[in-house]
Regions:
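N-terminal membrane-sensor/transducer module of prokaryotic signaling receptors
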Residues: 2-11, 15-160
């Protein structure tokens, strides 16, 4: 009887206390649906046309990929920034360990989602393009193969 109780308690703890980053998801919204669809289409384009051709498309201003607050970014799974047309100075840098304005290691969470789950959501505080003050942001991440190397493609939205 005691063993059964301990097993039940252990199982309940696992269900309730699973990895925090895998439990995140934004409230259902048109913004969240649009970002998830955008990332899914971007991953398909990378798979179909390859990294170089896809990244050329993702950098085109006023396209479905880059307009207003909407942009795609790509990292390898070590945290090297391969694409970020909204913040081009970040390209070629490593973001592993970067924290948001509240001290959350959000970049590590993004890398973990891609590596461990293949896709998912992460929330964090980040400035909108052209601004310096952080705002709440939700990012949808999807693991992809970038010219034979594992990486991720992502985009996000700032809730209205």
């Amino acid at each position: 009887m005691t063993k059964s109780l301990l097993v039940c308690i252990a199982l309940a703890a696992l269900v309730i206390g699973g990895p925090a980053y895998s439990q995140e998801a934004p409230p259902p919204s048109d913004q969240a649906s649009a970002v998830k669809a955008l990332v899914t289409r971007a991953a398909a384009l990378i798979e179909k046309d390859g990294k170089t051709a896809a990244f050329t498309e993702f950098r085109k201003k006023d396209s479905e990929w880059l307009h207003g607050d909407t942009y795609l970014y790509a990292y390898d799974l070590k945290g090297n920034v391969l694409l970020n047309p909204a913040f081009p100075k970040r390209e070629g840098t490593n973001i592993a360990g970067d924290k948001d304005a509240k001290g959350k290691p959000f970049q590590d969470d993004i890398l973990k989602v891609a590596a461990a789950q293949g896709s998912g959501w992460v929330s964090y505080m980040f400035p909108k393009p052209g601004q310096t003050e952080p705002s709440e942001k939700w990012a949808y991440i999807k693991k992809v193969t970038l010219d034979g190397t594992s990486g991720l493609i992502a985009s996000g939205f700032y809730p209205k």
